[in-house]
Amino acid sequence: AIMRLKLVEKDISRIEACMGRYSIRKFPKAFVMANCSDLQEGLRTWFKLSSTIPGLDMAYFYNVLTYTGQDLEEKGTQLLLYEGLEKGLGQEFDRSLYSMTEEPECIYTIIESEYTHPDFDMIHKMVQWAHKHGLEPMECVYANDMTSFFAKDRTTYCLEIYMPFKRIASPV
């Protein structure tokens, strides 16, 4: 329970520091617990895994999307457990069963949304920021619903977004 609270504290600090700002950050190193077709399948898989591996409440759901310049399409959901958290899971967790994420450099931001997924305009703004900074975003977008709260008669989600890129020019 203490590890989970520390994760929440870290998430809240990151939200306060990064909300509405763009930066470059590596995608987190994590165990890929499952690749699912959507968030609903991800939740079912998480419940199934949780019955055999205690402590999986520390896993994160990353929605995977594709940005084409004209559209933003959902591709699935990854259930990720950040590296280092496996120490709190006990012997039931066999790390050899899971692949690790790659850690590409990404355009990074946290945004508020009415939905659990970013919309096209949110990602398009990230792409515009990237181009201004000599970066060429790839099509893949990862969105993590960090937390939500109720305000102004609606639920608001804090989405952590990673978008891998390649450099097309030297940074100024």
Regions found by a protein language model. Name each.
Residues 1-172:
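A solvent-exposed interaction/effector surface
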